Amino acid sequence: MFTKHYDVTIHNAAGAAETISLRLPFAAQSALGKKYSKDTISLILAAATDNDIFVDVLTNSLNWKGNANAITTGEELVEALIDEGVICDDVSRVRLMIEIGKASGFISDAKATALEREMQAIEDNLTKEPEEAEADKTETEKN
């Protein structure tokens, strides 16, 4: 039986490419929601800035029934993803969470696109010069 999941490629200690398959099972979504008192979408977005939530989501996403992942802890995966350049900031962490959400059936393609646009706007704003960002803010407040 095929199980939908999100694949990311990392390199192991020997330098060989390994595919890691991520999916957050429904039971894990429910358990994490109760643990952190958040609905699933809020949990995913909170993972951008909360290391405990991020690691918990990754650990649960690694260990779904039928997976063949060599890595089994979120901590190991975070280090591997940093080394690969997959995650380097809060925005890249949210993007990874969005992909896991799509593969796990709780974020639609349309919702993912909307979230990506929001993330891009945040990223664009963060890379602006302070004067340019302030001018944009003033223009937005006028409208």
Predicted regions located by residue number:
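Short, hydrophobic/amphipathic alpha-helical patches that form generic packing surfaces
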Residues: I53-W64, R95-K102
